[in-house]
Amino acid sequence: MGSRELNLRERQVLGIIIQLYVVTAAPVGSRYIARNYSLGLSDATIRNVMADLEAEGYISQPHTSAGRIPTDLGYRYYVDLIMKVQRIDEEEKRRMESDFGPISMEGRGTSAEVLVSAAKVLGSISRQLSVVLSPTLSNAVFEKLDMVLLSSTRMMVVLSIQSMFVKTIVMELQHELTRQKVDEVVDLLNERLSGLTLSEIRRSITRRLAGSSCDTNLKDLIVRSADSLFDESPIFERLYISGAEYIVEQPEFKQPERVRELITMIEDKFSVARLVEDIAPKQDLKRTAGHDVSISIGRENSALQAEDLTIVSAPYYAGSMVGTLGILGPKRMDYEHAVRVLNYMADCLTATLSDVN
């Protein structure tokens, strides 16, 4: 099924069916296409074209309708070979910049605030569920560290990483420490580790801290904890979600059971993060407007609960680090619009997070 390249008529009819279905959520009939589109084809000819498309698995007929709707295969052919992505229009561009700009201009706000803002703007503009994954930290460059004594036996370690990113971890102390001893270790760590990537620090911290006269107990604790301290945060802690109020308005989620299933999935942050991250390395990327945009449709998704959804994702950059933006919605999605706004938000995030390096 779907092994050959479609001819011009078939491509035109498939494109029209998908574009109409995206807007109306109603099956599309041959008579409507013949009357409203100047294809130079009769109703009977269009009906025959639709029969061929159905036979090859690109469209299907709901039991209660004479019209046709796209299948996963039809959507896949559309996004790979028919869809044309235009530049974002000026009105939408101004709206995104006005909503995202205040938190991002001139490096104002923390990295978390910037990513929360990006998720909100992306959800509002796309009218779908938006997901922002903060960058993985393996190649992140360590800038400085500080230690805050919470009590005589507890302290919080704050790592400042390139592009405004911060990681914190609370550590239990086996021995009481003075502020002076803590400051000596902080100075040592910043002097010997600043400018290294987190992966380099994990591999070489023992050697790099050797020969110092700082507090041995605290220094040894830092070395023993290096794999957690200078490592990735759990994936669900890197996730920012917005737009649930928009996706539940879609006709696909009118039934209460469907809404419950969707909300359950959204609340499982680990699963949502994995869904978006899992499609990023795929080889069948849709290359558009300078971005590697990955589109995973229906049963292409790794999770059973996402078989009725489409996930569109794109990378953004913060120095040497790479994060992921995503839009989740029903398969009946405006794909061209989703790719367009995702591309532009990726540009905005990359510019914002690069400006502070």
Swiss-Prot record:
Keywords: Repressor, Stress response, Transcription, Transcription regulation. It comes from the Bacteria. InterPro entries: GAF-like_dom_sf, HrcA, HrcA_C, WH-like_DNA-bd_sf, WH_DNA-bd_sf, WHTH_transcript_rep_HrcA_IDD. Pfam families: HrcA. GO terms for biological process: negative regulation of DNA-templated transcription. Negative regulator of class I heat shock genes (grpE-dnaK-dnaJ and groELS operons). Prevents heat-shock induction of these operons. This is Heat-inducible transcription repressor HrcA. The lineage of its organism: Bacteria, Pseudomonadati, Chlorobiota, Chlorobiia, Chlorobiales. The gene is hrcA.
